[in-house]
């Protein structure tokens, strides 16, 4: 069997010092349900993505960002020329960057912690950014930084993630 329906952090990140991985989602591939120990951020850069999360279907469009927490069954399908990026983040990195953005509003932090970590339906977040140019630029910069593999790139990526979360919450 080539596909594993469950993936642990060590399977993806291994001994890498990095906590964040970017990938372009392959188009025209079979849809398969899966879950994993890390966070997945689906970013629809252009076009449409058919996404099912815990049995609930969603059609994501250009500019939409979906945060899927660990241990959440989901699938993604792209069957045209759409461009979708996946950002895969270790759980500890997500917590340290995302919740650092929320320190000023403990009620909001509590809400997100509840939504993202409870084992109930709907424990994911979808942001409709309406293709906000600042968020689009940040995604591009995150991707370029990731591909560059320059010295201190993971420090930059963690810092950029904090800014990205703050932009989404605006």
Regions inferred by a protein language model and the residue ranges of each:
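A hydrophobic/aromatic-rich effector-binding and dimerization subdomain
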Residues: 1-19, 79-144
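Short intrinsically disordered, low-complexity coil segments enriched in acidic
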Residues: 2-6, 67, 170
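Detector for methionine-enriched segments
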Residues: 7, 21, 56, 73, ...
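Generic alpha-helical secondary structure signal
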Residues: 8-10, 62, 150
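N-terminal regulatory/effector-sensing and dimerization cores
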Residues: 21-109
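An amphipathic alpha-helical interaction segment
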Residues: 126-170
């Amino acid at each position: 069997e080539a596909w594993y329906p469950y993936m642990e952090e060590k399977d993806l990140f291994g001994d890498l010092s990095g906590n964040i991985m970017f990938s372009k989602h392959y188009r025209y591939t079979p849809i398969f349900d899966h879950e994993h120990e890390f966070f997945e951020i689906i970013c629809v850069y252009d076009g449409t993505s058919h996404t099912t999360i815990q049995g609930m279907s969603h059609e994501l469009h250009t500019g939409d960002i979906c945060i899927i927490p660990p241990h959440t069954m989901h699938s993604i399908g792209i069957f045209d020329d759409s461009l979708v990026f996946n950002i895969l983040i270790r759980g500890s990195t997500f917590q340290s960057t995302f919740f650092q953005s929320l320190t000023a509003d403990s009620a909001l932090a509590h809400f997100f912690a509840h939504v993202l970590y409870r084992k109930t339906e709907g424990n994911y977040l979808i942001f409709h950014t309406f293709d906000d140019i600042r968020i689009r630029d940040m995604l591009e910069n995150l991707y370029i930084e990731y591909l560059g593999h320059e010295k201190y790139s993971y420090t930059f990526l963690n810092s950029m993630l904090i800014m990205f979360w703050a932009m989404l919450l605006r």
